[in-house]
């Protein structure tokens, strides 16, 4: 059973910036190159994986982030039950992808923390700790980047205007959250 420990204990709000850990959210990494892999994902999840670099696709229940030409992160849009390690999406993909040797499916729910940031000061915060140029990124809804923030590897997903999802490894999440609150 999932022993989910919240790394970020509270929601933080400042003028122009709000930060909260979205908990718990199912997160999977899927990898594959074959056309059959992409087709099986589409049929299984009723969504198409993004094939253009640094983009995302979204359905009612799931979002897929492009990480590399053969790697995507799929996460649930809503919270999942904390009393289980079993996710219907993972079970379905294991059956239709892994067992047919079309690709790999890895549960990274416990590995990554998802922090939702809202407000018009998000990119001011990011620019103080990242070498990435956010000028074009912030105007493209659904764009994705993997970058460094305060010397920590992160995945940033531009959800909406002035709203982003930031994925960080659990072991670095408290440090990053403290840096963002400083």
Listing of model-derived features with the role each one plays in the protein:
Residues 1-182:
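Basic, glycine/lysine-rich polyanion-binding surfaces/domains
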